């Protein structure tokens, strides 16, 4: 697997797809790796701190599905849930 970082534009596209999902309040970090023609994403999304484990799991599943179904050639995505920082 190549460890070269994809262009900033691709990173922004991945973040935009995840950010537009219901329940996602922010993106803490996003790591992308390329292997052949496909990409592998490791993304930490922020959700409301009071969200239940079940709600967080459902949000993560929807984000993963949306990323893998996008036209961005994402072969797999690992979505981590983080609490959105309190103001």
Residue ranges and their predicted role:
Residues 1-87:
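Alpha-helical transmembrane segments and adjacent TM-loop junctions that form the membrane-embedded core
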């Amino acid at each position: 697997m190549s460890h070269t970082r994809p262009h900033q534009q691709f990173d922004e596209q991945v973040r935009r797809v995840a950010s537009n999902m219901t329940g996602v309040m922010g993106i803490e970090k996003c790591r992308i790796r390329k292997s052949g023609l496909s990409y592998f994403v490791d993304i930490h999304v922020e959700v409301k701190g009071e969200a239940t484990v079940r709600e967080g799991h459902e949000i993560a599943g929807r984000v993963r599905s949306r990323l893998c179904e996008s036209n961005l050639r994402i072969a797999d995505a690992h979505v981590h849930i983080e609490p959105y920082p309190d103001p």
